[in-house]
Amino acid sequence: MKKIIFKSFLLLWTVLLACSCNDLLDEKAYDFVSPEQLGDSESAASQLVTGAYNTVITSFIAPGSYLYLTNMDCDYASGASWAFGNVGAGNPQGFWGIDHMWQGSYTLIHRANLGISKISAMSNLSQESKQDALAQLCFLKAWAYFNLVRNYGPVPIFRKSISEGEAMSQPRASVSDVYAHIIELLEQAEGMYSKDDAGFVVGHASNGAAKALLAKVYVTMASGAMSGVPIVVKGGDPNIFEPQSITHIAKTVAGYESFDPAKYYALARDKAWEVINEYTLFDNYMDVWAIGNRNKGEHIWMAQAISGDKDYGNTICHDYVGIFKEDGTMEGNWYGMRDHWYLLFEEQDTRIVDGVIHRYASDGISNGKVIYNYYPRWYADKVENKE
């Protein structure tokens, strides 16, 4: 009798456990809205597009790793030794954000692919807004692949989301195939609203942004394919004060052999003219940096960061330019440009006269006076001589 009761109890427990496991495997979203919960509406499409745009900030701008990986190893970047021990010394493997470019780009591609799948199936939004939403997601995918191919060469192409049936393990596509896909995406992205259309959302990309990026893609293909052409750059021994002219002979970048430089330079020129005719430059150089001019004038597409926010802020400005505190000292400003960069400009060039912070207070005080830092270092003589 005891055995019968025990077996009955065991059977009941097994059935209950199986039911519980099925319930556990059924995912329920409590603290976020899943794509399936959005529904079919203008608002649903907007949220899917916004979710993809969010990746630009959270994976590239807010961490700061995007600019570090693409700029730290240039000839003119400078800063403290602790900041240039890996990427700035040509050794990105030791950098904390080494994977951000790869992961961020493919996260953006995944979200854009998912958005394209969901929006394509919607029927309760206008044809115009549907086309615009799909074109924006194509633009974001193209931007991500353009980052990938320039930094890694051959990379996998995911034409649709993994959750929609795309195989997770994709082989690396050739450089030429990646560029062909980028061009295809940007040609579709030209279907976005223009910046002057009533449906355009400020802060989003427009068809002008698609044209501008396509022109940049063409010129990158052309320049990478060049061979045997002399290229003169400014540089030289760091002990030499004035930058020296150095001549290099261009060699075709691996993977760019099939591109015709003349053809793609011509395509870049023609596409760039379409952009030039649509946008205007600001009258004054410093207007470029005015907060009130964001997303206006010559700003074709901007990352929409939130000042002071650790998740959605722009750490690049904090780390490179710095932020003035109430006492006049500066927070951040860890990285900057070498004196050689400054000397590339004529002395009265507005870009360095007004566009460079030449003096800022340090944290120290000597004999009751504030100690200042100067850039470039000889600017201290100008101040002392009241020039």
Residue ranges with predicted function:
Residues M1-C19:
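Sec-dependent bacterial lipoprotein signal peptides
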Residues V15-S41, I182, A215, P230, ...:
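Bacterial Sec-dependent N-terminal signal peptides
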Residues C21-T70, W96, V288-W289, N293:
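Membrane-proximal, proline-rich intrinsically disordered regions
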Residues K28, V149-K160, M226-V233:
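Short, well-structured active-site flanking segments
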Residues G39-I61, G79-Y152, G165-V202, N373, ...:
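Conserved, well-structured interaction surfaces
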Residues E42-A44, V49, Y53, A80-H100, ...:
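Elongated scaffold/linker segments in the mid-to-C-terminal portions of large proteins
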Residues P63-Y76, S194-A212, S223-G322:
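Short, surface-exposed recognition loops and adjoining beta-strand edges that mediate ligand/DNA contacts
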